[in-house]
C-alpha cells in the first residue's frame, strides 16, 4: 500500500511537470526576471527593457524583481532554487562567470544549477586616465607607466565590478602592479579621476562616453578587436591595434532558468528572448546604453553555455593570480 501511494505521488508530480511544460506560461501567472543587483543600475535597465519586449511573444506579464547582495550571488542562488516552471528566470552579467573565482564559497554551481537560455548583449570597456596625465595616447601611456612603477593608482567601482576585472587583466597584460583603489560605484571613481585623485580606470563605455566626448578624461583605448562606431568613441583606437595584442574585454548579459526546467519551456523562453532581441525598440534602447545586441547564434542556449565556460576559464586565473577575493 505504501509503495502504491509513493508511486502515485511520483506519477502526480510527473504529470504536474508535464502540464506545466505544455501550458507555459500558466494563465494569470507572471514571469519574473530576477536581477541580482539594485534597481537603476545597468543590468536592471536591460532587464526592464527585456521585460517589456518579452511580454508579447510570451503572452504573459513579465516583471522585474531586484534581489541584490554579495556581488549578485544572492539573486542567482534564489533562481537556482526556484520552481522549475519557467516563471522565474535570472538576468546576470559577467559575474555569472567570475563569481566562482571571486567567491571561495559558492551556494550554487554556475554550470550545473541552471538552464542556459541565451546571451543578450555586450558592453565594451574603455581605458581612461585623469585629464592631467602627460600621456596623450597608449604608446605614451606605456612609457609613463614604465617610468612610474609603484606610484600608479588604478580606480575601480568595487571588488568584483567590471572595472575591477578589467583593471586586473590590464595590470597582468602590461606586467605592472598598480595600487587598486576600490570605490562604491562608478560615479565616485569617475569624479576622482576627473579631479586627478587617481590615475587610471577601465570601465564600460556606458559610463565613460560622455566624459570622453567632453574631454574631462583622457581615452587610451577601447577593449574590443574593432573600433566602435558611436560618435563619442569612433576616433578612439583599440588597445589591440595600439600594441596590447588580443586584449579583448566586454561585459555581457545572459538569461538563465533553474536546472530541471522542462525542455519545451526552455525552448519557449529562448524563442521569446530571440524575438525580444530583434525588437527595434529594444535594440534602440540598448544602443542608447552603449550595448550591442548579440546575434541569433549567440542567443542559443548551448552556445551561451560554452561561452560562459570559456569565460570562467579566462577570468579564474586572472582573479586567483591577483589574490583579490570578494569574500
Segments and roles (model prediction):
Residues 22-25, 81-87, 101-188, 239, ...:
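Hinge/capping helix and adjacent helix->loop/strand transition within the periplasmic-binding protein
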Residues 28-30, 176, 263-327:
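An extracytoplasmic/periplasmic, membrane-proximal ligand-sensing/linker region
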Residues 1-28, 326-327:
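Short, low-complexity disordered leader/linker segments with a strong preference
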Residues 22-112, 151-153, 159, 175-204, ...:
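N-terminal (or domain-start) structured segment
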Residues 45, 49, 53, 74, ...:
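Extracytoplasmic/secreted proteins, especially bacterial periplasmic and envelope-associated proteins
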Residues 93-94, 131, 205-206, 224, ...:
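Short secondary-structure boundary segments
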Amino acid at each position: 500500500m505504501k509503495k502504491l501511494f509513493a508511486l502515485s505521488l511520483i506519477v502526480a508530480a510527473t504529470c504536474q511537470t508535464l502540464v506545466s511544460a505544455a501550458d507555459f506560461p500558466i494563465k494569470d501567472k507572471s514571469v519574473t526576471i530576477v536581477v541580482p543587483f539594485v534597481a537603476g543600475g545597468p543590468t536592471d535597465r536591460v532587464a526592464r527593457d527585456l521585460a517589456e519586449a518579452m511580454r508579447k511573444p510570451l503572452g504573459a506579464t513579465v516583471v522585474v524583481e531586484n534581489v541584490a547582495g554579495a556581488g549578485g550571488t544572492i539573486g542567482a542562488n534564489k533562481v537556482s532554487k526556484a520552481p522549475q516552471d519557467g516563471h522565474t528566470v535570472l538576468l546576470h552579467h559577467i559575474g555569472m562567470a567570475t563569481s566562482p573565482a571571486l567567491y571561495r564559497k559558492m551556494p550554487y554551481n554556475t554550470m550545473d544549477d541552471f538552464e542556459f537560455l541565451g546571451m543578450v548583449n555586450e558592453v565594451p570597456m574603455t581605458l581612461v586616465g585623469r585629464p592631467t596625465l602627460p600621456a596623450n595616447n597608449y604608446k605614451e601611456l606605456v612609457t609613463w607607466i614604465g617610468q612610474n612603477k609603484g606610484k600608479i593608482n588604478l580606480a575601480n567601482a568595487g571588488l568584483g565590478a567590471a572595472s575591477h576585472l578589467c583593471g586586473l587583466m590590464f595590470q597582468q597584460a602590461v606586467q605592472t602592479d598598480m595600487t587598486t583603489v576600490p570605490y562604491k560605484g562608478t560615479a565616485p571613481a569617475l569624479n576622482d579621476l576627473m579631479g586627478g585623485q587617481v590615475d587610471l580606470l577601465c570601465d564600460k563605455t556606458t559610463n565613460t562616453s560622455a566624459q570622453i566626448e567632453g574631454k574631462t578624461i583622457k581615452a587610451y583605448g577601447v577593449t574590443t578587436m574593432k573600433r566602435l562606431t558611436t560618435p563619442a568613441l569612433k576616433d578612439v583606437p583599440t588597445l589591440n591595434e595600439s600594441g596590447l595584442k588580443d586584449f579583448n574585454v566586454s561585459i555581457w548579459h545572459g538569461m538563465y532558468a533553474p536546472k530541471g526546467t522542462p525542455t519545451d519551456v526552455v525552448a519557449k523562453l529562448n524563442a521569446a528572448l530571440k524575438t525580444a532581441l530583434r525588437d527595434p525598440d529594444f535594440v534602440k534602447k540598448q544602443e542608447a546604453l552603449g550595448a550591442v545586441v548579440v546575434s541569433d547564434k549567440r542567443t542559443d542556449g548551448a552556445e551561451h553555455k560554452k561561452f560562459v565556460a570559456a569565460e570562467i576559464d579566462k577570468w579564474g586565473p586572472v582573479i586567483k593570480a591577483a589574490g583579490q577575493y570578494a569574500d
